Swiss-Prot record:
Disruption phenotype: Early flowering phenotype under long day (LD) and natural day (ND) conditions. Decreased plant size, number of grains per panicle, yield and dry weight per plant. This is Transcription factor GHD7. One of its GO terms (cellular component) is nucleus. A motif (Nuclear localization signal) lies at residues 198-204. It is found in: Nucleus. Residues 226-245 are annotated as: Disordered.
Amino acid sequence: MSMGPAAGEGCGLCGADGGGCCSRHRHDDDGFPFVFPPSACQGIGAPAPPVHEFQFFGNDGGGDDGESVAWLFDDYPPPSPVAAAAGMHHRQPPYDGVVAPPSLFRRNTGAGGLTFDVSLGERPDLDAGLGLGGGGGRHAEAAASATIMSYCGSTFTDAASSMPKEMVAAMADDGESLNPNTVVGAMVEREAKLMRYKEKRKKRCYEKQIRYASRKAYAEMRPRVRGRFAKEPDQEAVAPPSTYVDPSRLELGQWFR
């Protein structure tokens, strides 16, 4: 037969009167022992248990308060001596210009988090694998392999030598239009045409001119009123010639005798 808590005692969890565990928390310790430890429902006079701090994502509660919350921020904890001796370091992801909010999963150092260990050993020589050489010799070899040739008065560098020799020869044969002498001749001809156009433009006169001397003489003879040509007055009508013929002058008598 179980006996209830003594009078004046409080519940170990909620502080209700009765001591020990009240009727609401008496059977909770059976299903959730990690939430309600046995010390919470112990007998009379048991002190109230301290507040429990639950660690998520595999973080243990060891260490001071600063270490317990360091995984919530963007600062990685220093590597352990064993990992440092083995050459394993925590490497931050490269910055791509996008500021991401701090993630609770990124700063977990336990077994259940998303921690990446990257070996920062000797970097493989990719240049040697690509046949480009390494160190200062790479630039020397590239400079030695460069091909510099003259093309129509200008120079260009074919360092990669990706253009076939046949194509280069064809371009050199078809480059007569880019001959410096041809270009200079075209420029001189253009300048001559421009000078002729300017001289012809200077001689232009947009005022009224009389091109023929006969027109000029006729214009001087015509009367003017205030500088303008005036209409000439009507002349008297000339009498038409008489059609009467004197028969004596025609000597018609000798024909009709």
